[in-house]
Amino acid sequence: MGPLEFRDVAIEFSLEEWHCLDTAQQNLYRDVMLENYRHLVFLGIVVTKPDLITCLEQGKKPFTVKRHEMIAKSPVMCFHFAQDLCPEQSLKDSFQKVIVTRYEKREYGNLELKKGCESVDEGKVHKRGYNGLNQCLTATQSKVFQCDTYVKVSHIFSNSNRHKIRDTGKKPFKCIECGKAFNQSSTLATHKKIHTGEITCKCEECGKAFNRSSHLTSHKRIHTGEKRYKCEDCGKELKYSSTLTAHKRIHTGEKRYKCEDCGKELKYSSTLTAHKRIHTGEKPYKCDKCGRAFISSSILYVHKISHTEEKPYKCEECGKAFKLSSILSTHKRIHTGEKPYKCEECGKAFRRSLVLRTHKRIHTGEKPYKCDKCGKAFISSSLLYKHKISHSEKKPYKCEECGKAFKRSSTLTIHKISHTEEKPYKCQECDKVFKRSSALSTHKIIHSGEKPYKCEECGKAFKRSSNLTTHKISHTEEKLYKCQECDKAFKYSSALSTHKIIHSGENPYKCEECGKAFKRSSVLSKHKIIHTGAKPYKCEECGKAFKRSSQLTSHKISHTGEKPYKCEECGKAFNLSSDLNTHKRIHIGQKAYIVKNMANL
């Protein structure tokens, strides 16, 4: 018997046979052929890539390849799926019955593997010459191995146990470089190319290189925009079958993988692998630019983009560009208004699944992210990260315009808007414009009158979650934020920041009209109204307008007759706190007069 070649494990179909297979069977055929080819490459048997493999990688039908291009003239072993013999069988059965034909000189043999056979040795080969004599022989030259899940075509040199290992979940092949384990030696061989930097396939469109031809094939769909796989539940189209499989779990809510350490259930094995590193502290993926390490390669990939200014993904609606296609997809929902992720508890919908997961913790009370400095817990890692900055005095983010420094990059981004007059976010109700989308969202609540955030202590409701968070502090006497200069403590970090300006004497907020400077931006905003003469706050009862919201609030009391401000000395009540303060001076004057008279006695 000669050396094993690719044609010895090639699977061939006629046009009629191919059309007998459904889509799932055709996809399985393609996967089997590509995997068999990879096995032979790993063993060093195949040097040049056969046309059939190129055809399959490009998504073409196998019968379009000419026979002489796919299979050479020398002896051939072909596997024919007996779909025409058993059309009523399922996908599983169609791969459990295989006809093996051996072409050699003037003789050929037919081998039929019945359902239930462990290998060809249990079947019979009928060898027949031109003399019509039949003779039963036992096959020894090749074997077809059957797994309980489905039949996989495999040569004696490819090790039939490979498929069974995949079903058991064992990963005996370990990478010496990084310790990652695999269930197939061929997958390990492909993985090693990551460490060696070996590149075998290059995209003709953008020049991007890959160490797997299958990765190149998948990558090409970015340029073509092809989305072959459609979700039957929501109609969403996806580029890859693996992405469709993962996507379907959103609808089913299935979480197959459970962490043995904390009991957390996850939808994907890759997510479980990365999650386990939270418990071990392992961070094997290191950025070669800044040295920062991560628990998964995907997080490292996203992080690396932060080192480049390239933004190849552009929104056709507004022209805004992004570094990641996933961010662009999420961004597009701003224009469409689509919010596909809905909370089953309260009905609130979100554009991103991550935001929904974080939101659900509000209902469950779960706060898995804990600060190791003060013990405070949070519903998301981003909130914990922001909180940790409050313990640090570092301000690494500096404004190039005015030199002001900030602890957070997001705060710097918001600050930069103050240097421009552009207000791209417009309210559809009143045409008021804003510099930030968050400010527009907050403003919209004015029109709806909705106050969805309620305090559990006193029942008071708020329009913003941030206002509720701030309000909750009023129920506690704890003052976490301490001034290093005078040891004065505050309940709010913002109050501490404002207080610090007293020690510095700095007035960073300057009016462009008159040059007057202020310690707070809010005071500057109120001051600017003097120059504009605008009175944006209008009373719904009488139509009177005011420059400040606080003035409107005070005015509204005149319609209700309410007098919430009471003098402790004489019991007299007032509409306004300012009126109470003025009234108190009467009592102070009386006391001063009495003291003066007593001194003269």
Curated annotation (Swiss-Prot):
PROSITE patterns: KRAB, ZINC_FINGER_C2H2_1, ZINC_FINGER_C2H2_2. The keyword DNA repair does not apply. CDD domains: KRAB_A-box. One of its GO terms (molecular function) is DNA-binding transcription factor activity. Its main location: nucleus. It is found in: Nucleus. GO terms for biological process: regulation of DNA-templated transcription. InterPro entries: KRAB (IPR001909), KRAB_dom_sf (IPR036051), Znf_C2H2_sf (IPR036236), Znf_C2H2_type (IPR013087). A zinc finger (C2H2-type) spans 173-195, 201-223, 229-251, 257-279, 285-307, 313-335, 341-363, 369-391, 397-419, 425-447, 453-475, 481-503, 509-531, 537-559, 565-587. It comes from the Eukaryota. SMART domains: KRAB, ZnF_C2H2. Residues 4-75 form the KRAB domain. Keywords: DNA-binding, Metal-binding, Nucleus, Repeat, Transcription, Transcription regulation, Zinc, Zinc-finger. Disulfide bonds: none annotated. GO terms for cellular component: nucleus. May be involved in transcriptional regulation. Belongs to the krueppel C2H2-type zinc-finger protein family. PANTHER family: TRANSCRIPTIONAL REPRESSOR PROTEIN YY, ZINC FINGER PROTEIN 143. This is Zinc finger protein 90. It comes from Homo sapiens (Human). The lineage of its organism: Eukaryota, Metazoa, Chordata, Craniata, Vertebrata. The gene is ZNF90.
